[in-house]
Amino acid sequence: MEPSIYRFSLCAALPLMLFFGFYFLLAKTPEKAIFKNYLRSRQIMGIAMLLLSANYSVHFFFGIRFKNADSAILMNMSTYFLCYSLFSSALIMLLDRFYITKRRVWTHIILWIIFSTLSGVVLFLLPSGIMQKISLFALAVWLIVFGVVLARRVIIAYRRAIRVFNETQADDIGTYIEWLSIFTYWALIFGVGCGLLTFLPDESLVSTKND
């Protein structure tokens, strides 16, 4: 990837990410108990977007992708693992207010710490060679599986919502939720794909690392 094109894409994405991140965190909502779950979901979404903004900022201002490939891969793997958890939690809790529990939160945090630690060990302690490549492949598979599992939970939650609305509400509401479910399929596939393409080194990274 050309550095100029890469920087332009980051420059275009950063303002949008920052705007929506702060908007989700700080915008006013009706002060009613019924909106509490919605507010928590929006705040989690805002935190996830600001976390991605911080990641993009490091790439944009310091060009870490072209200076230290291992550090860039580690930062992206760790960031996307955590963002998968945050985005999925924000979406699911809109449909299932009991989804967020202390046990689930601690499980995701512990998994994130283990994943990030193992990524650092593989990238900085293992010598370059077949073992490092196999280990990186295993971590990539872990990230893919984690993303797919979370995506499946989101899709199941939306399908459950469709059934509930079909049984209790008007047809137009059920159709809307069904459309939202289809949109969610594509959003999740796009998000997981972008995450993988971001941390996997391209030809520029490989040549930089070899130099």
PLM region spans:
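N-terminal low-complexity or simple alpha-helical regulatory segments
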Residues: 1-121, 138
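Membrane-helix interface motif
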Residues: 121-126, 159-161
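Hydrophobic alpha-helical transmembrane segments
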Residues: 93-96, 123, 195-202
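Membrane-interface helix caps and helix-loop-helix hairpins in membrane proteins
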Residues: 67, 126-134
